[in-house]
């Protein structure tokens, strides 16, 4: 009967209580560290996620933020003044444009206090060159020219020795020393020269005008025979009629110089 109470039970071993105690201690310790580590891990992940999110949003803002330029730039771009200067028309001394488009040139004779009609031209540059040649004849080195560089070139050429007595530049003929050959002075506008003589001009002046490129272009003439040469040789009858009509307009409307004519 004494053994009936212990039937079906294992006999108790002394070392079994120690193993159970260690297992219970392990169950109490490891769950504590596991929960703490999971909390720390979640905190670290949350912190890293927040940091990465802030960096990403800051980068996106920098990309989408428009670039603002300083309007008070100390070195602003210079305005294009060269093109504006080319658009402005240059005014030449002794030249004015006719209502029908041609360019007229005239000069005031300082000795006679009268204006000398130089003719009409297709371009303003040709008319300005005619004025320069006449101004050099009347006033010499004191003349105010439209193209002073041409006069300087002619002066430099006159100091050279040897033939020829004239040179050509841009289809314009200039005599370096007219006194060496007074019989062949170029004058391409016979009609206006005759009118000048008819009004009391001095034939000895032998106006040496180079009007190449003008309306009444021609070849060189001897100044001694200009007054007797047929007018048809200077450009044809139709061209002379145009010259006569234009000169008649000059006599009718050209009694007073226009403003800024520079005569």
Swiss-Prot record:
GO cellular component: nucleus
Low complexity composition-biased segments: 227-238
Post-translational modification: Cleaved by the APC/C-FZR1 complex.
Basic and acidic residues composition-biased segments: 12-23, 240-249
Region annotation Disordered: where it falls in the sequence: 1-29, 54-88, 220-263
The keyword Magnesium is annotated on this UniProt entry: no
Keywords: Activator, DNA-binding, Ethylene signaling pathway, Nucleus, Transcription, Transcription regulation
Function: Acts as a transcriptional activator of the phytosulfokine PSK5 peptide hormone. Binds to the GCC-box pathogenesis-related promoter element. Rate-limiting factor of quiescent center cell division active when surrounding stem cells are damaged. Is a proteolytic target of APC/C-FZR1 complex.
Name of the molecule in the record: Ethylene-responsive transcription factor ERF115
Organism: Arabidopsis thaliana (Mouse-ear cress)
């Amino acid at each position: 009967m004494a053994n009936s109470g212990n039937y079906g039970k294992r006999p108790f071993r002394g070392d079994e209580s120690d193993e159970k105690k260690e297992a219970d201690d392990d169950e109490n310790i490891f769950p504590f560290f596991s929960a703490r580590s999971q909390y720390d891990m979640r905190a670290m992940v949350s912190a890293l996620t927040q940091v990465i999110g802030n960096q990403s949003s800051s980068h996106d803002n920098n990309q989408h933020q428009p670039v603002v330029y300083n309007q008070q730039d100390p070195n602003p771009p210079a305005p294009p003044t060269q093109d504006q200067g080319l658009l402005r028309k240059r005014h030449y001394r002794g030249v004015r444009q006719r209502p029908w488009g041609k360019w007229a040139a005239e000069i005031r004779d300082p000795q006679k206090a009268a204006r000398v009609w130089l003719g009409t031209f297709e371009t303003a540059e040709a008319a300005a060159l005619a004025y320069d040649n006449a101004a050099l004849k009347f006033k010499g080195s004191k003349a105010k020219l439209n193209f002073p560089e041409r006069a300087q070139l002619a002066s430099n050429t006159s100091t050279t020795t040897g033939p020829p007595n004239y040179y050509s530049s841009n289809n314009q003929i200039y005599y370096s020393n007219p006194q060496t050959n007074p019989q062949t002075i170029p004058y391409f506008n016979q009609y206006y020269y005759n009118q000048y003589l008819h009004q009391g001009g001095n034939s000895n002046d032998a106006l040496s005008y180079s009007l190449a490129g003008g309306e009444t272009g021609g070849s060189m003439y001897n100044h001694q025979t200009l007054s007797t040469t047929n007018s048809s040789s200077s450009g044809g009858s139709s061209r002379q009629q145009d010259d006569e009509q234009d000169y008649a307009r000059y006599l009718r409307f050209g009694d007073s110089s226009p403003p800024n004519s520079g005569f």
